[in-house]
Regions:
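Secreted/periplasmic carbohydrate-active enzymes, especially glycoside hydrolases
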Residues: 1-340, 352, 381, 396-397, ...
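Substrate-binding/catalytic cleft of secreted carbohydrate-active enzymes
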Residues: 337-570, 578
Length: 592
């Protein structure tokens, strides 16, 4: 599958598969020029799986902060063409060498990067090597759920080092389309298309074709007067059934994920020198009157927390079908979206969310501590995340901070509060089309959604604890004033401003069906008890007149966490239809 479905070219070479591999525990690879020495690599690894995973073929959990990759390839490119090398993600810092020449450095374990390697190619066979540096004990690195200790424990999982998303090559012309941004203007029924060329070339023209279910809707041709080109396309064209006035029309929703196809051709002197295909959806998200609106209609989100880990691949899905399977299983249980938790997911997952209709709250891995390094690293990664994923209609919310991770003193420290506010405004400055949550869970500053975590429902026999949990959720006033954690809902100096309130982590009922040691926030022993407890917890949510959505913890078991609705290998613990029946009990009219 092409790694970037919203930027799809025909002429590309997949570099996934077997690479030579080496650990560099003594940090001698640079000095000894391992980038030029195939003999320095004693192991073989299957890219894009990290060495800690079973599917890599190595399957070692011991920490190695520096690892090297090496492989050869051939590529056919004419004199007038360029060869661009792409990396989906390398955790954490990557130095890339081609034929013994250092071609780029990239920091950021969850974001993509590319480099033009044309000037470093030689006749015949090419050699590429990658040095990945991931100091596992550095707590200022945004690593999310990857544990900085040797063994996973609690809510922390196995570390991932090195290449964990696809690697590929593209052969392009001297001038080519480098970026495309697709912005829906829902109220106007139009779409804005912005493109950036790698360089300005006079006499270049951009030809576009936008279609809906193979019906041509808009077409035209622009003359380039700079490297940037921009145009608006009238998509609804004042047709009432294209808007969502009656039903969903041509809009994108989880229930009706309608998509537009776009084809772009870059033309010079009558010759097509670049061609790509993409897609987008007409989707709007905003808040008003204490509610979340999807396409200007009140919409209640029923989300599932999704860690994006697999037993054989860790952060990397075993196959593209596994992304699709997770979404279909979640929808089968009655969920309309997910919080992709502490991970920036592969674009192939977002593609399936777009295609199948599944809301996504996008996150970035968090550092453990607050310092100048962590601030700079987060700002850089978020810039790259939004640049890559902006055009996906499924993403409706950005979550830059979770549970004060990376800002442990935010409740009272003005400096860390400034950072939270800065991230809120920074993401809005980069993306005006989505909601932003300042600190999901508690100690919020400025935020579009009041996102609260509460696991205090207790065991079934703890009736007093459950009654307190239920009463806490019952009204907006109680949700803000009755604490479920040692931290306040809003940080010192900030207060509730009538935002929609969502319960964005709760549940976590532990149910072990595999015999492995593990934990949940509460526990049950069999399927009947699980469904009763799930009903009990969701009944408290449904009794609330203050909540405008929820996110249940969680989709699957992950390592020592056995609180998923599915096992780690995606087997249902209970009848999925029974889960859906409980999720379907709620209707929007129940909220004040």
């Amino acid at each position: 599958e092409y790694p970037r479905p919203q930027f799809q070219r025909e002429n590309w070479l997949n570099l996934n598969g077997e690479w030579h591999f080496a650990f560099d525990d003594k940090n001698v690879g640079l000095k000894e020029k391992w980038d030029q020495e195939e003999e320095a690599y004693p192991h073989r690894i299957k890219v894009p799986f990290v060495y800690q995973s079973e599917l890599s073929g190595i399957n070692q959990r011991e920490p190695h902060d520096i690892v090297w990759y090496y492989r050869t390839f051939t590529v056919q490119a004419m004199d007038s063409q360029r060869v661009v090398l792409h990396f989906g993600a390398v955790d954490y810092e990557a130095d890339v060498f081609v034929n013994g020449c250092h071609v780029t450095n990239h920091q950021g374990g969850h974001t993509s990067f590319e480099v033009d390697i044309t000037d470093y190619l030689v006749d015949g066979q090419q050699a590429i090597s990658v040095r990945a540096f991931d100091p596992h004990a550095d707590e200022s690195i945004p690593r999310g759920k990857q544990f900085w200790e040797t063994e996973s424990a609690g809510i922390w999982y196995t570390n991932s080092t090195g290449i964990w998303q696809p690697v590929w090559l593209e052969v392009v012309s001297e001038t080519y389309l480098k970026e495309i941004t697709l912005t829906p203007n829902f109220n106007e029924g139009t779409g804005t298309v912005e493109t950036i060329l790698n360089q300005f070339q006079p006499q270049c023209e951009l030809d576009y074709r936008i279609s809906f279910k193979e019906q041509l809707i808009a077409a035209g041709r622009l003359s380039a007067d700079s490297a940037k080109m921009k145009f608006n396309a009238d998509l609804f064209q004042e047709h009432i059934f294209r808007s969502n006035f009656h039903h969903d029309g041509w809009s994108w929703t989880p229930e009706n994920p309608q998509l537009f196809d776009i084809k772009l051709s870059l033309i010079n002197d009558g010759e097509t020198i670049d061609y790509l295909k993409s897609y987008f959806g007409m989707r709007k998200i905003h808040t008003e009157n204490g509610m979340v609106y999807l396409n200007n209609k009140p919409y209640y989100q029923k989300l599932i927390l999704d860690q994006g880990y697999w037993p054989s691949g860790l952060l990397t899905a075993p196959s593209d079908e596994d992304f699709k399977k997770d979404i279909l299983l979640a929808k089968e249980m009655g969920f309309n979206g997910c919080r992709k938790h502490q991970k920036t997911e592969d674009p192939r997952f977002l593609y399936w969310a777009d295609q199948l209709g599944f809301l996504v709250w996008g996150e970035c891995a968090a550092p453990a501590i607050y310092n100048e390094d962590s601030v700079e690293r987060l700002m850089r990664e978020w810039t790259e995340i939004i640049a890559r994923d902006f055009s996906h209609p499924s993403i409706v919310t950005w979550v830059p901070i979770n549970e004060s991770w990376g800002v442990p003193k935010i409740s009272f420290d003005r400096t860390q509060q400034h950072f939270s506010q800065a991230m809120y405004h920074f993401l809005h400055a980069l993306d005006k089309t989505r909601l932003v949550i300042s600190n999901d869970g508690w100690a919020m500053t400025e935020t579009d959604i009041c996102a609260i975590h509460n696991y205090a429902h207790g065991q079934k026999e703890e009736t007093e604890k459950y009654d307190y949990f239920k009463e806490t959720l019952r009204t907006r006033e109680n949700l803000i004033k009755r604490l479920s954690t040692p931290w306040p809902i809003f940080a010192n100096g900030f207060s509730y401003q009538e935002q929609p309130i969502l319960l964005t982590e709760f549940g976590g009922i532990g149910f072990d069906v595999s015999g492995q040691p593990g934990w949940g926030y509460t526990s049950v022993d069999n399927e009947v008890e699980f469904l009763k407890d799930y009903q009990r917890v969701l009944s408290a949510v449904y009794a609330s007149v203050g909540l405008w959505g929820y996110c249940y913890t969680q989709l699957t078991d992950v390592e020592q966490e056995i609180n998923g609705l599915l096992t780690y290998d995606r087997q249902p613990k209970v009848d999925l239809a029974a889960i859906k029946a409980i999720n379907d009990q709620f209707h929007v009219s129940q909220v004040e």
